[in-house]
């Protein structure tokens, strides 16, 4: 539950969430501070109220270097990849009826054959976080900073504007008939 909430409310990659420790977390100021594994970018991310509530309820130990998600951390360190955690997320989605089980089907033949890519993965939470921020009216610059996107082009690929936001956008248009 915690890694899913963290992905949803921060847009962090699973590799970054897996390596979070208590010293990354400032609950008094509701800020998560880390260095992105992929970009080495230093990030300060405000913690959403629901995610803060989750962290507040976690039993904190005496070691600030202790991982927030010990089993995910151990798997990430042992495997040097977040693949097993991503696969576990997929199984949760299948069990919840939100995704179909992987079939390992390919498209094409011979050297041109490509594995079918799942449309639902942990990375989708990064898209969802970006879209939620944009649909809530957060500026592009602020959304990009929270998610960690360096360019508008990348941010656009992660943004999916919902119909409610589009309807709200056209409400102020004048009636010219």
Which residue ranges define each predicted feature?
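C-terminal catalytic core of tyrosine-transesterase DNA break-rejoin enzymes
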Residues: 2-16, 124-150, 157
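Residue-level marker of regulatory loop/turn positions in helix-turn-helix DNA-binding domains and
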Residues: 6, 81, 114, 118, ...
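Residue-level signal for tight coil/turn positions that link beta-strands
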Residues: 27-29, 49
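Short helix/loop segment immediately N-terminal to the Walker
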Residues: 97-119
């Amino acid at each position: 539950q915690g890694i899913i909430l963290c992905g949803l409310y921060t847009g962090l990659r699973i590799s970054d969430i897996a390596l979070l420790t208590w010293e990354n977390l400032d609950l008094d100021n509701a800020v998560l501070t880390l260095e992105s594994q992929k970009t080495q970018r230093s990030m300060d991310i405000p913690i959403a109220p629901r995610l803060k509530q989750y962290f507040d309820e976690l039993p904190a130990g005496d070691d600030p270097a202790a991982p927030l998600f010990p089993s995910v951390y151990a798997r990430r360190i042992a495997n040097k990849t977040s693949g097993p955690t991503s696969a576990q997320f997929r199984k949760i989605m299948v069990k919840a009826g939100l995704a179909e089980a992987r079939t390992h089907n390919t498209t094409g033949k011979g050297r041109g054959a490509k594995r079918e890519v799942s449309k639902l993965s942990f990375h989708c939470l990064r898209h969802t976080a970006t879209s939620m921020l944009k649909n809530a009216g957060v500026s592009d610059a602020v959304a990009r900073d929270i998610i960690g996107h360096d360019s508008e082009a990348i941010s656009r690929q992660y943004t999916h504007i919902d119909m409610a936001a589009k309807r709200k956008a056209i409400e102020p248009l004048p009636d010219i008939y």
